C-alpha cells in the first residue's frame, strides 16, 4: 500500500519529501529525467527500497527552504507568532487611522457639507463630498476593469504577453519624448537612459515569450483546479477597494476639518495640521494596503504550494493558508509591508519636491529631487522583488521575515532560478495592466470632473493634480491586487517550488520542464553547499 503525504490543509496523496540526488549531467538529445524508480517514488507515493535515503542537498536531510531550527511540516509549521513587534506597531497605526477617521468623518457629517452625484458647481473651496463620491465611482471602475483584464489574460496569454511587453517599451519612449517636448531637461535625460535600456531589453526578452506563456498557462490551469485562488484574490480585491473608498472619504473629511478654508474647520485647523494629518493618512494607507495585498499574496502562495507538492487536490487548502497568514505570520507580513510603505512615502515626498522645484524654476532642486526619486524607486523595486519570495517562504514554513528572505534568496541563487525570474515576462503583464487601469481610472476622473465642474476646481485648478493622482493610485492599487494576488503569485510560488524540487514538475508538466531544462540546465542540477 502506498504511503500518503499531505502538505496542505486536508488529506490526499502527495509527494514524499525530496531526498534523491539529481543527475549531475544531461545529454541534450536523449534526456530521460530521473530513473524510473525515482519517478515512481514521487508520483505513486512509494518509498524507495534502499536502506538509507540519498542526500539531496548537502550533508543533512533538511529541505532546501527549511530554515535552521525549523519545527513542523511543510505548509504546517509549528504554531509560533513571528515578528510580533511589527504586528503591534501595525495595530497601533491602524487604531490611529480609525481614530482619525472617526474625528474627521464626525466633524464632516455635523458640518452638513454638500454631497451630490454628478452635480455641477458644487459649493466649497476644497475637496468635498462630491470628490469622495467620485473616488468611490473610480474604485468601481477600477474593479470592473481589473476583472476584464484578468479575463483577457486567462483567454489570450500569448497576445497579452506580446502586447504588454511592446506597450511597456513604447510608453517609456513616449514619456521620454514628452519630457523633452515639455522642456523638463533633468527628468528627460534620466528617462532617455531608461528608454534606451527598455528598447534593448525588448529585443532580448521577446524571445523568452514562449517560455513565459507556458509558465503562465500552467499556473492558470492550476488556478482552475484550485478555484479558491480566485476567491482569495477577489476577497483581497474587495477589501482593498473598500479600504481605498474609506480612505477617500477620510482624505476629503480631513481637508474639510483641518484646512482653514474647510466648511468643517475647527480651532485646530491650520496649514501645518493638514500637512501632518495628510502625511499620516498617506503612510497609513500605503502600509495597510500593502498588508492587505500581502495577506492575499501569502494565502494564494500557500494554495499553490499545496497544489505543487500534492498529487491530488487537497481540501481546505485556502482556509489553512489564510489562517496562518492572519495569525502566526501576520507580524512578518507587516514587517515586509512597512519597508515598502516607507519607500512609497519617500517617493511621494520626492515627487512633491520635484514639482515644487519645477514650479519655482529651480533646476538644481528639480534634478536632485528627480535623482532621489529614481533611487528610491529602484530600491523599492528590489524590495518588492525580494519580498515576493520571502512571503512564499513564510507561506511554506511560517518563517520570520528576515530569515525567510535570507533562506529564499540563497536558495534561488544557488538553484539558478534567479535567471528565470529575471527573464520572466509574467510580472510585466500584471504591472503593465495595473498601470493601464490606473491611467484609465484617472482619465475617468478627469472626464467626470470636466462634466460636473465643481466649484473648488473653478477656484483652484491645482486640485486637478490631487484628484488625478488619487484616482490613478486607486486604480493602480486595485488592479495590482488582482494580478499580484492570483496568477503572478502562483508563478512566483512555482519558481520557488521548482528550485526545491524540479522533478515534481517533470511528472506534472514534462513540456514545461523540458523547456526550462534546455534554456536553464543548471536548474535541474544538484545544489552545492
Swiss-Prot record:
<protein>
    <recommendedName>
        <fullName>Protein PNS1</fullName>
    </recommendedName>
</protein>
<dbReference type="InterPro" id="IPR007603">
    <property type="entry name" value="Choline_transptr-like"/>
</dbReference>
<feature type="transmembrane region" description="Helical">
    <location>
        <begin position="272"/>
        <end position="292"/>
    </location>
</feature>
<feature type="topological domain" description="Cytoplasmic">
    <location>
        <begin position="347"/>
        <end position="362"/>
    </location>
</feature>
<dbReference type="GO" id="GO:0055085">
    <property type="term" value="P:transmembrane transport"/>
</dbReference>
<feature type="transmembrane region" description="Helical">
    <location>
        <begin position="159"/>
        <end position="179"/>
    </location>
</feature>
<feature type="transmembrane region" description="Helical">
    <location>
        <begin position="326"/>
        <end position="346"/>
    </location>
</feature>
<feature type="transmembrane region" description="Helical">
    <location>
        <begin position="363"/>
        <end position="383"/>
    </location>
</feature>
<dbReference type="GO" id="GO:0022857">
    <property type="term" value="F:transmembrane transporter activity"/>
</dbReference>
<feature type="topological domain" description="Cytoplasmic">
    <location>
        <begin position="206"/>
        <end position="230"/>
    </location>
</feature>
<feature type="transmembrane region" description="Helical">
    <location>
        <begin position="231"/>
        <end position="251"/>
    </location>
</feature>
<feature type="transmembrane region" description="Helical">
    <location>
        <begin position="185"/>
        <end position="205"/>
    </location>
</feature>
<feature type="topological domain" description="Cytoplasmic">
    <location>
        <begin position="449"/>
        <end position="464"/>
    </location>
</feature>
<keyword id="KW-0813">Transport</keyword>
<feature type="topological domain" description="Cytoplasmic">
    <location>
        <begin position="154"/>
        <end position="158"/>
    </location>
</feature>
<feature type="topological domain" description="Extracellular">
    <location>
        <begin position="316"/>
        <end position="325"/>
    </location>
</feature>
<feature type="topological domain" description="Extracellular">
    <location>
        <begin position="384"/>
        <end position="427"/>
    </location>
</feature>
<feature type="topological domain" description="Extracellular">
    <location>
        <begin position="252"/>
        <end position="271"/>
    </location>
</feature>
<feature type="transmembrane region" description="Helical">
    <location>
        <begin position="295"/>
        <end position="315"/>
    </location>
</feature>
<keyword id="KW-0325">Glycoprotein</keyword>
<feature type="topological domain" description="Cytoplasmic">
    <location>
        <begin position="1"/>
        <end position="84"/>
    </location>
</feature>
<feature type="region of interest" description="Disordered">
    <location>
        <begin position="1"/>
        <end position="58"/>
    </location>
</feature>
<feature type="topological domain" description="Extracellular">
    <location>
        <begin position="106"/>
        <end position="132"/>
    </location>
</feature>
<keyword id="KW-1003">Cell membrane</keyword>
<keyword id="KW-1133">Transmembrane helix</keyword>
<feature type="topological domain" description="Extracellular">
    <location>
        <begin position="486"/>
        <end position="529"/>
    </location>
</feature>
<feature type="transmembrane region" description="Helical">
    <location>
        <begin position="85"/>
        <end position="105"/>
    </location>
</feature>
<feature type="transmembrane region" description="Helical">
    <location>
        <begin position="133"/>
        <end position="153"/>
    </location>
</feature>
<dbReference type="Pfam" id="PF04515">
    <property type="entry name" value="Choline_transpo"/>
</dbReference>
<feature type="transmembrane region" description="Helical">
    <location>
        <begin position="428"/>
        <end position="448"/>
    </location>
</feature>
<feature type="topological domain" description="Cytoplasmic">
    <location>
        <begin position="293"/>
        <end position="294"/>
    </location>
</feature>
<comment type="function">
    <text>Probably involved in transport through the plasma membrane.</text>
</comment>
<keyword id="KW-0472">Membrane</keyword>
<dbReference type="GO" id="GO:0016020">
    <property type="term" value="C:membrane"/>
</dbReference>
<feature type="glycosylation site" description="N-linked (GlcNAc...) asparagine">
    <location>
        <position position="114"/>
    </location>
</feature>
<dbReference type="GO" id="GO:0005886">
    <property type="term" value="C:plasma membrane"/>
</dbReference>
<feature type="glycosylation site" description="N-linked (GlcNAc...) asparagine">
    <location>
        <position position="271"/>
    </location>
</feature>
<comment type="similarity">
    <text>Belongs to the CTL (choline transporter-like) family.</text>
</comment>
<keyword id="KW-0812">Transmembrane</keyword>
<feature type="glycosylation site" description="N-linked (GlcNAc...) asparagine">
    <location>
        <position position="422"/>
    </location>
</feature>
<feature type="transmembrane region" description="Helical">
    <location>
        <begin position="465"/>
        <end position="485"/>
    </location>
</feature>
<feature type="compositionally biased region" description="Low complexity">
    <location>
        <begin position="22"/>
        <end position="48"/>
    </location>
</feature>
Amino acid at each position: 500500500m502506498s504511503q500518503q503525504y499531505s502538505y496542505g490543509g486536508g488529506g490526499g496523496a502527495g509527494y514524499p519529501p525530496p531526498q534523491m540526488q539529481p543527475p549531475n549531467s544531461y545529454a541534450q538529445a536523449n534526456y530521460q529525467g530521473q530513473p524510473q524508480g525515482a519517478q515512481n517514488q514521487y508520483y505513486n507515493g512509494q518509498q524507495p527500497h534502499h536502506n538509507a535515503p540519498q542526500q539531496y542537498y548537502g550533508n543533512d536531510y533538511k529541505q532546501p527552504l527549511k530554515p535552521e531550527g525549523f519545527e513542523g511540516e511543510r505548509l504546517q509549521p509549528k504554531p509560533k507568532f513571528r515578528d510580533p513587534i511589527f504586528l503591534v506597531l501595525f495595530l497601533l497605526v491602524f487604531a490611529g487611522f480609525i481614530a482619525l477617521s472617526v474625528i474627521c468623518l464626525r466633524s464632516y457629517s455635523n458640518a452638513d457639507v454638500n454631497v451630490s452625484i454628478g452635480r455641477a458647481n458644487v459649493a466649497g473651496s476644497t475637496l468635498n463630498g462630491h470628490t469622495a463620491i467620485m473616488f468611490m465611482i473610480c474604485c468601481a471602475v477600477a474593479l470592473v476593469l481589473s476583472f476584464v483584464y484578468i479575463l483577457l489574460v486567462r483567454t489570450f496569454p500569448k497576445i497579452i504577453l506580446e502586447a504588454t511587453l511592446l506597450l511597456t517599451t513604447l510608453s517609456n519612449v513616449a514619456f521620454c519624448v514628452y519630457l523633452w517636448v515639455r522642456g523638463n531637461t533633468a527628468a528627460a535625460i534620466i528617462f532617455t537612459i531608461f528608454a534606451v535600456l527598455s528598447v534593448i531589453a525588448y529585443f532580448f526578452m521577446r524571445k523568452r515569450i514562449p517560455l513565459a506563456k507556458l509558465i503562465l498557462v500552467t499556473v492558470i490551469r492550476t488556478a482552475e483546479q484550485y478555484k479558491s485562488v480566485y476567491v482569495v484574490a477577489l476577497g483581497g480585491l474587495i477589501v482593498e477597494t473598500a479600504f481605498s473608498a474609506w480612505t477617500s472619504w477620510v482624505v476629503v473629511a480631513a481637508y474639510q476639518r483641518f484646512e482653514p478654508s474647510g466648511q468643517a474647520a475647527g480651532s485646530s485647523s491650520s496649514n501645518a495640521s493638514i500637512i501632518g494629518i495628510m502625511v499620516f493618512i498617506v503612510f497609513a494607507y500605503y502600509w495597510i494596503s500593502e498588508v492587505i495585498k500581502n495577506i492575499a499574496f501569502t494565502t494564494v502562495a500557500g494554495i499553490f504550494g499545496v497544489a505543487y507538492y500534492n498529487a491530488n487536490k487537497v481540501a481546505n487548502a485556502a482556509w489553512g493558508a489564510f489562517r496562518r497568514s492572519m495569525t502566526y505570520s501576520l507580524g512578518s507580513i507587516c514587517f515586509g509591508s512597512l519597508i515598502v510603505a516607507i519607500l512609497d512615502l519617500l517617493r511621494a515626498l520626492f515627487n512633491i519636491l520635484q514639482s515644487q522645484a519645477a514650479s519655482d524654476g529651480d533646476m538644481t532642486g528639480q534634478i536632485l529631487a528627480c535623482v532621489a526619486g529614481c533611487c528610491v524607486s529602484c530600491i523599492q523595486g528590489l524590495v518588492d522583488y525580494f519580498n515576493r519570495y520571502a512571503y512564499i517562504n513564510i507561506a511554506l514554513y511560517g518563517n520570520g521575515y528576515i530569515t525567510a528572505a535570507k533562506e529564499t534568496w540563497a536558495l534561488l541563487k544557488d538553484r539558478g532560478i534567479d535567471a528565470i525570474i529575471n527573464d520572466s515576462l509574467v510580472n510585466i503583464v500584471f504591472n503593465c495592466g495595473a498601470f493601464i487601469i490606473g491611467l484609465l481610472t484617472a482619465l475617468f476622473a478627469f472626464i467626470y470632473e470636466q462634466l460636473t465642474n465643481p466649484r473648488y476646481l473653478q477656484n483652484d485648478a491645482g486640485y486637478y493634480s490631487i484628484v488625478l493622482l488619487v484616482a490613478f493610485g486607486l486604480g493602480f492599487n486595485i488592479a495590482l491586487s488582482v494580478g499580484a494576488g492570483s496568477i503572478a503569485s502562483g508563478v512566483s510560488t512555482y519558481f520557488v517550488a521548482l528550485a526545491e524540487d524540479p522533478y515534481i514538475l517533470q511528472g506534472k508538466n514534462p513540456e514545461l520542464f523540458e523547456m526550462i531544462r534546455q534554456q536553464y540546465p543548471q536548474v535541474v542540477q544538484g545544489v552545492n553547499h
